[in-house]
Every structure is written in structure tokens, then in C-alpha cells.
């Protein structure tokens, strides 16, 4: 009989729990198989699966892609080899399923029918784990989209059986013992976007357990500890659970605070016991969650207990006694708070950062969380992945749940909540649409942004009147690098790092920053200068560091510094205080330091460019300096149009004429004129329903223009100095007394 040996690889996210094996076309030809046929997979045990064709990237690779449950049934791991041959499957007359010991499952009234519908046409061998997806309308609830492992206790006839419409499916309530291998049901297929991290953890954890001889040959000790660190919600604990399931090693879990006891010496005793149990049961894995809570830096803690626990952990992990085949995996989101003695080779040899997923990772995670969901055709997961910058796995899970809840709300009016059973016709009609995800997106924000999240202003470029040159400048500097980075790559240049908008008050600098934030779809962090300054030494700099760290984490991001002059005045001048000097230093290192500012754009606005520290205004930091000056006649007319679009105007009103007369008025002045004119009209007649030209003229008498000749001269002078590429001349401040800056 034809058979081949293939290497086991991880299944595609959508195949998890479906009993599918993916083979390349050559193997299918060699074994005379066509898609939909049944094959036997022989590892340490024999199981069966249905064959499908693999994607193009897996052709000619000698691999078979099967999910975690099929791997557990065949008792093989990823990277091991299995024998494949065509199976003679008979129709199953009866199939008896029971939950494993540790699963708590209650079966509802129509549970057997539900399960049968899910496993129709699936091959089963006795003692197989048969995963059943729990969906939102399932009679036994786990979280939707998670597989519940049931065990095939007996099949009639024996051997490879196929579940058909005629099969009698029985469910037994009492759990079946002797099945250690069902685990918590979490496999590598349940983890999206961490391909490299999984690979690194596996070579550290699985290799020493399965093939210790490799390390003996190389004459080295296998690694003993892995520290997973990264922002909350990225999947550190999930990865540890999957590793425990897939390696078939004994698994011991320590939740940080649980082992701390009030009695002297008891915390250390508990820790010693766990390590001793692990040694007796080796090969084994000890997982410590929230490591920073039980092993903080000893110089920072006041309590004696924590110090003793840290010392005990250090001796257990690398003491005089060998600790056998015991690997310690720990997770923390505050890696800098962990005692440095733990972070050396021999204790935690490897530190693996589990970061925020990129676009491809987010799409994988979305596929995992929506695989049990009836999606309508208009849901495009790759566009969704594109819209969820900065989301971690936990945020995406929350997004999927929120979308499903919104879909449910649509059907709620049709459901009679007093009835026990919901009609199957309604359940089959339930579907999650694109609008549900859109609505969910507005409610779920990335968890890393919670402290700094700004509601995105709904302001577009159309709301910014005039200023065409300044607008184009800002678009080139900010929108191109974020939306079309390939332009810069093609030309072989780096995009600008930061943009400084300067100009008289009221010209629309902040408005432009808001429009940019809205148009780029980037995350927007707004920093108001004075908010960052603190009376405690080091706090202001820390706030700036954290702002930039968050921005890098949830990139692409636009950081907007309003009133930069209050935050970064020139250093070394009389009257300057130490705080602002330290803040300037921190800003300089963040903007052009050793760390890359990938996909983070910085925009700042100021109306006093002359007092900003000159080191900030050089290329590589704020390298685009854009003057937002007074609008021309066309611009003023546009601004008036924007501000009077909701105002009923009389027939005699000519906005063009008003624009021609409004020389020296900036955007905020014109907005003021529009408002004053409406109030004038109401003064004349409380029941007035339109605003006439006379009202506008009266309003112009009351509103003074912001811009004077002296002021414009001052800004032109500043611009000339910028173009001469020296920082603004400090002496210009002596002349600024009569310009209106007191």
C-alpha cells in the first residue's frame, strides 16, 4: 500500500478544529487522493483526517498541515514526521462521545443534534479527541469560538469511521478518565501573529525535552528559563498555555501573589515545593505569571517577604542542586521592575518580547476570533486589520465580541426571552455584518492608548479655509510618509521627522493638526505643553518618554505638541528654569536619538518661534518649518463661507466684498465677525431670520484685526532667519515689544 512520510506543520487559522489535513498536489497524486478523501495519519497513535489541498506557498515542501487536536490524536508535535496513507473509511452506525475529566460541560436538550450537525462527514477513530466549536447559540457555553474537546469513547464498527446522517450520536454526561492529553484545548492555532515568537519558544522548550542528545553532542546545557515580556493583552499567558499543551510535559502554574503568605518562611516553602514536584514529574514546565509581583527589585521593596521570595527563586533557578528537566517560563508586562539577578543567563536565558502585532498579525488574530462566527460577505478582515492600528490580541477579541453583541441586538426584538428554545430558523438567519464591526470599532480603543487617547476631531481639509501653500506643505510632510511611504523609498530619502507650524495667533495652526490627524487614520496623541510640567524632579521628562514610547507601540501615530514655546524654551537664558531645560534635552533625544521613530510623526504649533530652543529647529528634528500666515482674499472668502454655511444670509450679502475689506483679519477673527453679525441681526430684530450686509459691516467695526504690519514684519523676519538656517535671532525679541507681544 502506498504511504509517505511527511513533516508535521501548524494548521491554517481557519482549519482549526475541522479535522482537515492539508497536503500538496504532488503528494495527493502519489497517494491517488482527491480533495475530500480520508487518510490515516500514523504517529505514536493512529488517527484519521480529511484531505484538502494546501496553499501554493506549501507546495513541494513535504509537509502536512494538521491542527492541534489531530496532532494530539496522533501524539506528534510540530516538526516531527508521520506516516500518511489512504484510509478505507466505513460509515459509522453509532458514535459515543463523552467530555474529558477536567472539562465542565452541561449538555442542553438538543445537544446531540447540534454536535452531529457540526461533525457530519468527519472521520473518527475510537479514543480520538473530537473538537466541537462552541458558538453563540450552543447548548453548552464556553466562550464562543473556542473548541470543546469531546472523546470518542466507542465507535461501531471499529477502525476509521465516517459520521453520516444515519449515524446515531450519543452524548454521555459523566466524564471519561485517563485522558491527560486534552489539555485546556489551546493549541498553536489559537495564537495569531506570533509566528517567530512561537518558533523561538519552541526551540527552547521542546528541543531539550524531546531531543536532549543534541545538547549533549554540542556539549552545552539546554536553556532553562524564558522570560516573556510585552504590553498587556499581547498573548504571553496564552503562549505559555499552548506550549504546555503541545509539549505533553507536566505543567505547574504559579500566579504571583498566590504564594505570598503571612507566616514566616511559608512563601519560600511553597516555592520550594512547586520546584520539587516539578523535578519529580520531569520533564516539566513551571509557568510564573506576573513575575514582577513576586520578584521585584530588592532595593525598591520595603517588605522583608518579597526579598526572601526573590532570594529563594534565585537559588531554586540556579542553585547548587541541579533542577533536572525543568524549564521555567515567566511572563510580565513590567520587565524593568524585575530583579536584575533573575535576568542573567542560567536563570532566564532568553527574554522574548511579545509586542503589538503588525497588520498581518492582526488579520491572523481576527481570523481566529471570527472563525466560529457567521460573517456576511461584506466583512473584509484585511481592511479591518488595516483599521486597527495599535490593537493587541485582547483588544481584537473584545472587538469581535462587541461586533457579535451588536448583531445580536438587531435580532433581539424577534426573540421571545421567556421561551426556553429559540427557533432554529432564527438562529440560522443570524449573521454579523460589516456595520457591526464598524460600530464596534468606535467603542473599542487600543488598550495601550487608554491613558492618552484623544477623541479624533471630525475635521477635514475642507474645514480649513485658505492657506493652500501651508496645507500642501503639511500634507507632503505628514500624509505622504504615513499613507504612501513608497514614494520616499523610491527616491531613496528619509521622510521629514517633524513639522513646526508657526504664525500669528488665530491663523489655524491647531486646526490644521486636527485635520491631519483625521485624514491620515493614524492614532493621535495630543500633548499640551503646560500639562506635562510637574513639580517633581524627573516627572516631566518621564511623561515625554512615556508619550513617545506609547506612540511607537501603537504606530502609525501623530504626536501633536500645542504651544511648543511653553514646553521647550531656549536653554541657558536668564529666567529659564531647570525643568524646562531638562524637558528640552529629553525632547531632543526622543526626536533624534538612537531609537528609530518609525511611523511616528511629530507636529508642533507655536506663535513664538523666536523663543524655542534652536537645537529643536534643525534638520532631523523639526525639519519642515511651515509658516501659517494671514490668508489672502480668496482664503478669507473661503473661511467666511465655512463660518456662514449654516447662517441664513440676506440677498445683499457679498462675501467677496467682505473678504476684500477684511485685510489683516485671520481665521479666528473672521469666525468672530460671522458670529457678531448674527448677534447684530438679533439685536435689530429678535425675530430676524437672516443676516444682512449692514450687520456684517457693524460687526467689522467691533472686531479688530489681529495682524498689524509690525507683526507681519516680525514673522517675515523670523522666516528669513529660518531660511538662512540659523535659529531665530534672540535679539529680535527686543524689537518684539511694540509688536504686540508684551
UniProtKB/Swiss-Prot annotation:
Region (Disordered): 722-742
Record's signal peptide: none
Keyword set includes ATP-binding: yes
Pfam families for the chain: AAA (PF00004), AAA_lid_3 (PF17862), CDC48_2 (PF02933), CDC48_N (PF02359)
Biased composition (Polar residues): 723-734
GO molecular function list: ATP binding; ATP hydrolysis activity
CDD domains associated with the record: RecA-like_CDC48_r1-like, RecA-like_VCP_r2
Keywords: ATP-binding, Nucleotide-binding, Repeat
Binding site for ATP: 230-237, 503-510
UniProt entry tagged with the keyword Nucleotide-binding: yes
NCBIfam families: CDC48
PANTHER family membership: AAA-FAMILY ATPASE, PROTEIN CDCH
Entry similarity comment: Belongs to the AAA ATPase family. CDC48 subfamily.
Function in brief: May be part of a transduction pathway connecting light to cell division.
Protein name per Swiss-Prot or TrEMBL: Protein CdcH
Gene symbol of the encoding locus: cdcH
